[in-house]
Amino acid sequence: YSHPELMIDWFPILGNHEYRGNTQAVLDYTNVSRRWSMPGRYYTKVFEKKGTAIRFVMIDTAPLIDKYRNESETYPDACKQDMDQQLAWIDSVLTVAKEDWVVVIGHHPIYAETSKDDSERSDMQKRLDPILRKHKVDIYACGHIHNFQHLRVPGSDIDYVVNSAGSLSRKVKPVEGTLFCSPEPGFSIFTADKKELDMHMIDKKGKVIYTVKRTK
């Protein structure tokens, strides 16, 4: 965390592990660290460079999933969140988004190969995916599963991406819709111009092992 290359702005989102504790403390850390920039449980940021603009919509997925809402002893804050309010906010932000590219980032996957409860993804498919499809977002990127995955599904032009973890990684196998998967630990970076948006998956040695490409 103190490496010179990490002295940049961080834009966090909440995941299931944060919901096991005090989620407000994660937001409040914004007041402690200059790098930590988390204005709310969900928020949006626009980055523009050399005439190309990307909108990132950072969302809070645990409250969208019944499993977390119903297990109030383990995830005490999840059931306190207004799910409909967040979904309406996502819809409103995407309605007015005019940037070249739009990327939505949440902790939980909509589509992915995983041994985790199917109900997690079915809730995401029921509640979030229709909004993303309606507004034709470019990429939905998530974590939670600790490996790299890229999927496309019939009826949707969205690239569904799972980003790996910087620590524990897990095995993965292809399923219907899988274009790429890898158990490597690592991270991803975005590059873009007016005609192409790339999400580069990078392993622990710094090698690009796969790139999600979108073109116009």
Spell out what each predicted region is.
Residues 1-98, 118-119, 123, 127-139, ...:
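Extended active-site neighborhood of metal-dependent phosphoesterases/phosphodiesterases
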Residues 16, 61, 105-109, 144-145, ...:
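Short, well-ordered beta-to-alpha junction loops that form the rim of enzyme active sites
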Residues 97-114:
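Short acidic, glycine-rich surface-loop motifs adjacent to enzyme active sites
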Residues 206-208:
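Residue-level signal for glycine
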